[in-house]
């Protein structure tokens, strides 16, 4: 029997499932309104997410979106029912929704690239944790180094460090 050598090879089949994320961003303060995840995105799922984020009376005036086929008649009808004006961008023009493109890059660089996602539920948890960090703690130069949800200046005291996403990010506060 031959001993293993560098010329020996081994193979193992594997598959990778994709999990899709949905981020909805409010432009005025760059606040993430919604973060969702699914393994099987459909027009019905997108419509349900829009209803969850907008409710029936809290809807924004416009939805700026790309021209993906998933935004079909079902989503268009839901936007009409929520009284949201649909504003698809021009074909192959991602710069027309630059704030969201920047957000997706931040989520990838600051979060998902450093976490092994174990499934749809886990990705949803990771995105919601990052959304809380992004909205309440992470500073933005365009907001004069404030967070999307403004916070009061804290009184003098001992500084406490709270880990976020298992220590990937930290929030500092005074007690």
Spans of features found by a protein language model:
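Charged DNA-binding/catalytic regions of mobile-element recombinases
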Residues: 1-175
């Amino acid at each position: 029997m031959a001993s293993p050598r560098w010329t020996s090879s081994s193979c193992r089949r594997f598959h990778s499932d994709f999990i899709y994320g949905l981020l909805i961003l409010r432009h005025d303060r760059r606040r993430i309104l919604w973060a969702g995840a699914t393994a099987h995105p459909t027009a019905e799922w997108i419509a349900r997410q829009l209803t969850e984020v907008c409710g029936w009376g809290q809807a924004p005036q416009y939805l700026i979106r790309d021209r993906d086929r998933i935004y079909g008649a079902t989503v268009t009808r839901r936007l009409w029912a929520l009284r949201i004006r649909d504003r698809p961008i021009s074909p192959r023009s991602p710069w027309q929704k630059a704030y969201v493109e920047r957000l997706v890059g931040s989520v990838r660089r600051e979060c998902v690239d450093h976490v092994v996602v174990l499934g749809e539920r886990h990705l949803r948890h990771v995105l919601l944790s990052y959304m809380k960090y992004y909205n309440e703690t992470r500073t933005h130069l365009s907001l004069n180094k404030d967070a999307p949800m403004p916070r009061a200046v804290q009184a003098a005291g001992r500084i406490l460090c709270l880990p976020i996403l298992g220590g990937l990010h930290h929030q500092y506060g005074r007690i």
